[in-house]
Amino acid sequence: MMGLPANTRIWIAAGVTDLRRGFTGLSAQVQTKLEQNPFSGHVFVFRGRRGDLIKVLWFDGDGLCLFAKRLERGRFVWPQATSGTVSLTRAQLSMLLEGIDWRRPERTWEPQLSV
């Protein structure tokens, strides 16, 4: 995971994004559709149409960073809204990147005592 400064906000871009876009295209989308500054130091997360690929745009103070992750199975959980942004915590971002439902995390395995 990236070492984010303490005051960094994490924004999910609701809806579907054309992930053929790179630094320039995603920065323009942050400015026009999300009405944010891509050089603010905040993290912006985008999801493609199929839902198995996300891109993360972040300005680290020296330059823009663009990270991508594709799930081999399943889809990333995404907000139902078709436009705007949703704010995440760092823990929720970690869950999102692992393919976990960050809206309602549940324990899927509980250890059993040996008898």
Regions found by a protein language model. Give the residues of each.
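Polybasic/polar functional segments that serve as interface/processing modules
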Residues: 1-115
